[in-house]
Amino acid sequence: MMRTNVIRKVIGMVKGLLPFYLFVLLPLSAQAGDYNIVPLPQSIALQKGEPFTLDATVQILAPSALQQEAEFLQSCLRDMVGLDFPVVQKRAKKVRYIELAVSPKVTSKEGYVLTVGSKGVTLQGGSAAGVFYGIQTLRKSFANTSPASLLQMFQLPAAVITDTPRFSWRGMHLDCSRHFFSVEFVKKFIDLLALHNMNIFHWHITDDQGWRIEIKKWPKLMEVGSHRTGTIIGTNSDIDDQIPYGGYYTQAEAREIVAYAAARHITVVPEIDMPGHMLAALASYPELGCTGGPYQVGHYWGVYKDVLCVGNPKVYQFVEDVLTEIMDIFPSEVIHIGGDETPTEKWEACPKCQGIKEKQAHFTKRVFDFLTSKGRRALGWDEILDGSPQDAMIMSWRGTAPGAKAAEAGHDVIMAPTTHCYLDYQQVEDVLFEPSRCGGFIPIEKVYSLDPAPDSLSVEARQHILGTQANLWSEYMTNEAMVEYQALPRMTALAEVQWTMPERKNFDDFKQRLGEFTKYLEYLHYTYCKHLWPERQIPNRWQF
């Protein structure tokens, strides 16, 4: 045993020293990388001249205002090559730099210009966010190097890359109500967004099957609403496993996630889904419903008939209290208020709700006005479109038509149609060894084909299409690997929809670039569907 421990220590020392010998002591050859990355930049102009070689003499030059971005790049390179490239603020002679800067010459706030040459790399962004997206391009380009042996270094060809995103809203959604995921996994998921140049994390944290965020003024939401007595087994089943299930995020944990995302230029948009999808809240406080209960936290999937009572003044006090605490945690200008799948039967039979015309529109306006008074904007699913205030933002999920209608009416719109963007749907036709899933079949080609702002819209309407996102509803995603598997690589296809101009897109070319990118995903320990690469699959068994 002692001899084994000594051997392990020696191996550990060798691993620790290997990057140093690799970059400093050995006579090295070099392997050139490329810029065939995803999402594809808007312009890549290869230049004459020698490539840039990443060796131990390179330093990262950045002003104090970009210290966070410089340290992120340092961390990425450390993970890739095992060296800590120094971050400095002053230039020295005979040193090659990766230089980060914000420049007024880059007119797009999220845009950047990356200049690569033998003497160094210069990355100029329109803001710190633009610099950050340039760093993503840099790290993915280095990842494409794929050294053939330990005696090779990382190189990039001389080039000038000029880039800026097509859309300002580039998002991913994660449902943490149906199934609860750890803080560490949420952070890993946010890292995945950053890798894809995404800037919005839509966090679904309340629903019928569980209330997942601490609200101090209404403690039963955690004591009762965050736990259910069991969970339906399989798809289209009425069999309950009778195993208690629950969990919630403390406000401190939520703030930690918000800060983690902000460091990656990602805004966390929380969703408090109402007035439907509120059974967990009703189980906690039955007086908020039309019948007064009793209610039980949902344990099967689908739509429940019990909703918040729009004729009860206490409901609006509840909503304002919840949103006040939510706004204190989440600095996002946009707060998602749900509004989808709200049955009206209970309202129609409720004495308190009589006399209120257009009941859902009445509720939506009350919530909208409250958020507006606090300097925030309300975003809801496309059901809120009819009767909603002009400044309400619409998330179009029932196809693209509601989004087109909303945009033509002057609403700001995010396209997230089930036809293209519901990544909990199956992605391969042969489902024998696939996980359970909701809905139908959305192959990666379908995701890639989405145009959120087609020419069929008027010029004015296209200006109201802020962007697009994909949604991951977690009814059948019982663990973290399943979330990643359902997301990838379709999420990567959507990233190119969000970022790259349509005339630059080509699916066959994308598939070639995707093949290399997925190897980097493996290196970063993400699980993905390998159906496009049969040689990577293990036959006749689960693929994750």
Name the predicted role of every residue range.
Residues M2-L18:
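Bacterial N-terminal signal peptides that target proteins for export
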Residues K15-P27:
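Bacterial N-terminal signal peptides
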Residues A32-F167, M482, V497-H525, C529:
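Contiguous, structured surface segment used for ligand recognition
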Residues V38-L40, L46-Q47, L54, E256, ...:
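Substrate-binding groove of N-acetylhexosamine-processing glycoside hydrolases
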Residues Q68-E69, F180-S182, D208-E214, P275-A281, ...:
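Flexible loop/turn segments at secondary-structure boundaries
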Residues L83, M198, R264-I266, R376, ...:
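Short glycine/serine/threonine/alanine-rich loop segments
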Residues T107-D306, V310-Q317, V322-V334, R366, ...:
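Feature activates predominantly on carbohydrate-active enzymes
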Residues R170-H173, D238-I239, E341-Q354, P389:
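Short, conserved helix/loop micro-motifs enriched in His/Cys and acidic residues
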